[in-house]
């Protein structure tokens, strides 16, 4: 979706395999949630 702010998680390490785990880590960082993104499967948090 256009217009959504995403930033790379600071606490998530390794390949992002599940959106649920990524979202949990992002919420722990104070973001709204997150998901795995891109070819390199990085955890991106929604701000």
Curated annotation (Swiss-Prot):
A GO biological process held by the record: defense response to bacterium
PROSITE patterns named in the record: GAMMA_THIONIN
Keywords: Antibiotic, Antimicrobial, Disulfide bond, Fungicide, Plant defense
Disulfide cross-links: 5-47, 16-36, 22-43, 26-45
Disulfide bond is among the record's keywords: yes
Pfam families in UniProt: Gamma-thionin
Keyword Disulfide bond in annotation: yes
Entry-linked Gene3D superfamilies: Knottin, scorpion toxin-like
Stated family: Belongs to the DEFL family.
Function: Fabatins have antibacterial activity against Gram-positive and Gram-negative bacteria. High activity against P.aeruginosa. No activity against S.cerevisiae and C.albicans.
Official protein name in the record: Defensin-like protein 1
Organism of this sequence: Vicia faba
């Amino acid at each position: 979706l256009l217009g959504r702010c995403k930033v790379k998680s600071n606490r998530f390490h390794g390949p992002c395999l599940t959106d649920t785990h990524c979202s949990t880590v992002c919420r722990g960082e104070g973001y709204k949630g997150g998901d795995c993104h891109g070819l390199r499967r990085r955890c991106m948090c929604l701000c």
